Amino acid sequence: MPLVYFDASAFVKLLTTETGSSLASALWDGCDAALSSRLAYPEVRAALAAAARNHDLTESELADAERDWEDFWAATRPVELTATVEQHAGHLARAHALRGADAVHLASALAVGDPGLVVAVWDRRLHTGAHAAGCRVAPAQLDP
């Protein structure tokens, strides 16, 4: 399988059991390499903490997810936030109506420069923007 770029929403699917978790796991298990912006690290930690605050995860489940996250992150090739990625993200934010973090993820994925790259994303805006920018996205479509 090709390289797969995981945004924070895709990583959360790996760490919790929810719709899309099976596909995220298959992408992780089958890819030649997993990549993501360094921005994903704090985003995922924040998402896990929010899930615990909302009582979607118990303290024990949170501890397990945080431990698993460290393992996933250690196996991920980080894409650095260079000046080029920064500037491209600014343009992508406007072109695709993206939030700042989503624009950074899309610019980071595009910076990889691999035409076979798959972008694993469950965030609706980023999914739409990545598709419009010509990326292969997984899942192919998001449920309405």
Curated annotation (Swiss-Prot):
Keywords: Hydrolase, Magnesium, Metal-binding, Nuclease, Toxin-antitoxin system. SUPFAM superfamilies: PIN domain-like (SSF88723). It comes from the Bacteria. Signal peptide: none annotated. Gene3D superfamilies: 5'-nuclease (3.40.50.1010). Belongs to the PINc/VapC protein family. This is Ribonuclease VapC49. It comes from Mycobacterium tuberculosis (strain ATCC 25618 / H37Rv). The lineage of its organism: Bacteria, Bacillati, Actinomycetota, Actinomycetes, Mycobacteriales.
